[in-house]
Amino acid sequence: MKVAVVGATGLVGRNMIKVLEERKFPVTELIPVASEKSAGKKIKFKGKEWSVVSPETAVSMKPAVAIFSAGADVSKEWAPKFAAVKCYVVDNSSYWRMDKTKRLVIPEINADVIKKSDYIIANPNCSTIQMLVAIADLHKKYKIKRIVVSTYQCITGTGKKAVDELDAERNDQTGTKTLAKALKNGIKNVNTCSASCYYSPRGTEGRKTTTAYPYQIDLNLLPHIDKFLPTGYTKEEMKMVDETHKIMRDNNIKVSPTTVRVPVIGGHGESVNLEFAKPVTLKEVYATLRKTKGVLLQDNTLPKRCSTKNPYGEQNKAIGAELPKYFSTSSKTAAGKKYLEQLAYPMPIYAKDRDEVFVGRVRLDPTVKSGINLWCVSDNLRKGAATNAVQIAEVLLSKKFI
């Protein structure tokens, strides 16, 4: 089967190619697609090298599936052209998501909506995907009335330029103080910045132009993802509202989001508060989450060695096998290793290159009649983008549309 990956040289595009190979999608011919300046570059896949071609050339090759991650403008122009030659398009951009004629799909939740005539299918926003995978089964069982979510979104969501920028800031290549200096001396502020200013306060060097963010990201948090709207919300925040309604097929769910960019890699974190229409118990919530497809429960905040008994039992010891790799100093002693094996909650560093949505810190919300708080983490380049897109292609395959 011919499969095109549009945006093959970007962070998400490279992950799409990786996931296609990992999941053994039946690709007989890979068509890596990028801009004219990348034409001729080589992409490795299944032990072979494949040449990058232009979108126009790719359309003429008539692939069965084209997975897009090249931005809204490219999707707007080229998705219909691929669809016109009976190629199914799975688009990771925001362009088609809220189009009433297009399906917006998380396979674990609403794969049933895909019909044979759906030649353009939208991939949801990364932050929406991980939240809904975590809570969709809870909604089926207890009916969610309201969601309050704050996101902690890693820099890879902005692309390679953001990764390079954070590296440069941390390596003191652009005037940013090193962490040690910053902790000792503090960070000077630059108080003069017009509404259109896209400069960053960077230590004693003052303001320097930045390519990825309006302000320094290292040692900082930016409550600003995508453009601000007249309401004061950002487009990223409204994506979570609108996409939740469309995917869950329930416009009555109230969604109140705040999205924040954080200087980490590995995945996005989300603090999620849910209010339900029906009564819940923690035991029932844990049982539901354990059975939720795509979710790995990592919630052991009261290890055995603590004097307080953990009423929820031991969850997912698998993380215990991973923890000592990253905390080698603490795990040198038997006691340290035992502690790390038992204490568990989701963290971005462990989500990297994984496809699960990790859920933890589950607890009742005492301020409402029926509600919980939870924390979820997922690799935004994988389940938040590439893996979800490939899973949609797998649905097309399972339905024998391709």
Can you describe what each PLM-predicted range is?
Residues 342-350, 354-364:
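Short glycine-rich, acidic/polar surface loops and turns
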Residues 266-270:
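Conserved glycine-rich beta-strand-loop-beta hairpin in the small C-terminal domain of fold type I
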Residues 1-197, 203-217, 252-254, 301, ...:
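N-terminal Rossmann-like NAD(P) cofactor-binding subdomain of oxidoreductases
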Residues 121-130, 232-241, 384-388:
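A glycine-rich, Thr/Ser-enriched phosphate-binding loop motif common to dinucleotide/cofactor-binding enzymes
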